[in-house]
């Protein structure tokens, strides 16, 4: 029972990943609307930021799976 509670608590990071991706994409969109000519040059930074934010969610999901099935 305790490992399921721990796994549930570990998935809180998934919500943080969603908030992080939304924050990165929203700020990119706001900047692109202010200066459309600079938007294509910032596309790589957008993808790197989204990848870092999403990686934290994937790590928390893997920790939750490890807590449920390996411990």
UniProtKB/Swiss-Prot annotation:
Keyword hit for rRNA-binding: no
Main location: membrane
CC per GO annotation: plasma membrane; proton-transporting ATP synthase complex; proton-transporting two-sector ATPase complex, proton-transporting domain
Superkingdom as given in the UniProt entry: Bacteria
SUPFAM superfamilies xrefs: F1F0 ATP synthase subunit C
NCBIfam families the record matches: PRK07558.1
Function summary: F(1)F(0) ATP synthase produces ATP from ADP in the presence of a proton or sodium gradient. F-type ATPases consist of two structural domains, F(1) containing the extramembraneous catalytic core and F(0) containing the membrane proton channel, linked together by a central stalk and a peripheral stalk. During catalysis, ATP synthesis in the catalytic domain of F(1) is coupled via a rotary mechanism of the central stalk subunits to proton translocation. Key component of the F(0) channel; it plays a direct role in translocation across the membrane. A homomeric c-ring of between 10-14 subunits forms the central stalk rotor element with the F(1) delta and epsilon subunits.
Protein name per UniProt: ATP synthase subunit c 1
Upper classification of the organism: Bacteria, Pseudomonadati, Pseudomonadota, Alphaproteobacteria, Rhodobacterales
């Amino acid at each position: 029972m305790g490992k399921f509670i721990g796994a549930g608590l570990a998935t809180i990071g998934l919500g943080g990943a969603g908030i992080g991706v939304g924050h990165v994409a929203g700020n990119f969109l706001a900047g692109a609307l202010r200066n459309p000519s600079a938007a294509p040059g910032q596309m790589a930074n957008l993808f790197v930021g989204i990848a870092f934010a999403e990686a934290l969610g994937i790590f928390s999901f893997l920790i939750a799976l490890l807590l449920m099935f390996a411990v």
